Regions:
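N-terminal and secondary-structure boundary signal
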Residues: 1-342
Length: 342
């Protein structure tokens, strides 16, 4: 039996059911997710390789909560408009999403409340989706576990009313029964991505990673598979890049919005206050490779400012970014990336 056949048998439906026994018992979603197919790939006409927007406002940290939320929402809506060079904010969002879409907003909440996507950032994304005609009931804020979402300050909503918010572990079947391959990565995908979502919005945080160098858009997608810990050797290269070649990601990921309101240049992926700073910005793109390249450059510059060694000298250069570019997933050369600052 070859390796691929072995793993397919190993991760059969029976194995998956036995591998996640507690998840079924701790089920919090009182219904099964409906299967939705991607109706159209017309949005790919807007897919702008090598184009990145940085929306930044240094006044963000000093604003009161209501004004801060309003300003962050403006940055998101205007940032997507500038990214797509659209004639208006509604036109920009309508070019990416339609009322028939079921949208998963994949967060990165491993580091807890201090260094996870801010609720006001997610609120701004939801506002954009509403402009595109997406119903609240068709929007799902999502992470690996309910615990991570709660720890980051989000409220779980498993009802059929309003914007949903829950982890893969809240489902009776959190991961597919069938093993999928993407290069050397063999994993079962979250059913939220494989079954429910027709569109994916990737919301990482601007921070470093002790093994991969940085954990940004592409690394955040380790949270959509059941066995990410298997793929951390060699600075997670080529695994991070290869995972993004899978159709579930390649065909559904429509927007990357990296939360850099608070960023971290050392000690990640967990929160380390001494290495965090107010970048006060958002990185917005459709090109995950370009977004990661820009994010890594920001982190390297901050490290230099603080007299920290370059990531390469610490043995954790984010090699996966160049690998992803080599796979045709996007642009990693900084001098070729069209960077728009607003």
């Amino acid at each position: 039996m070859n390796r691929r056949a072995f793993f397919k048998r190993l991760f059969s439906g029976i194995f998956v059911a036995k591998a996640f026994p507690l998840l079924g018992k701790e089920k919090k979603v009182p219904y099964s997710l409906t299967t939705h197919k991607v109706a159209s790939n017309s949005w790919k006409e807007q897919n702008l390789i090598g184009r990145v927007v940085i929306a930044k406002d240094l006044n963000i940290p000093s604003l009161e909560a209501e004004l801060r939320s309003k300003r962050v929402k403006e940055m998101i809506l205007e940032g997507v408009k500038e990214l797509l060079a659209a004639p208006s904010i509604p036109a920009a969002w309508k070019s990416l999403f339609s009322p028939s879409d079921f949208v998963g907003i994949k967060l990165s909440c491993l580091a807890g409340r201090q260094l996870s996507p801010h609720p006001e950032v997610v609120d701004g994304i939801v506002a954009g989706l509403r402009l595109a005609g997406v119903k609240d009931e068709n929007i799902l804020i999502w992470e690996r576990t309910n615990r991570e979402l709660i720890g980051a300050g989000f409220t779980i909503n498993t009802s059929k009313k309003g914007v949903k918010c829950f982890g893969s572990d809240a489902l009776e079947l959190p991961y597919d029964a069938t093993l999928q391959f993407a290069g050397s990565v063999g994993s079962c995908f979250s059913t939220i991505l494989s079954t429910y979502c027709t569109a994916l919005i990737n919301v990482p945080v601007l921070k470093d990673h002790d093994l991969a160098g940085v954990t940004l858009a592409m690394k955040n997608l380790f949270g959509v598979i059941h066995n990410p810990n298997r793929y951390h050797d060699n600075n997670c290269d080529p695994y991070i890049a290869e995972l993004s070649t899978h159709p579930y990601i390649k065909d559904k990921q429509r927007l990357i919005l990296c939360d850099g309101l608070l960023a971290q240049c050392h000690g990640g992926p967990s929160y380390k206050q001494q290495w965090a700073w107010n970048f006060s910005g958002l990185i917005i793109s459709q090109d995950a490779v370009a977004a990661d390249a820009i994010g890594a450059d920001i982190i390297e510059k901050k490290r230099k400012e603080l007299n920290l060694k370059p990531l390469k000298e610490e043995g954790r250069a984010p090699k996966y970014i160049a690998t992803a570019a080599g796979l045709g997933l996007g642009e990693n050369r900084l001098d070729k990336i069209k960077l728009i600052k607003i």
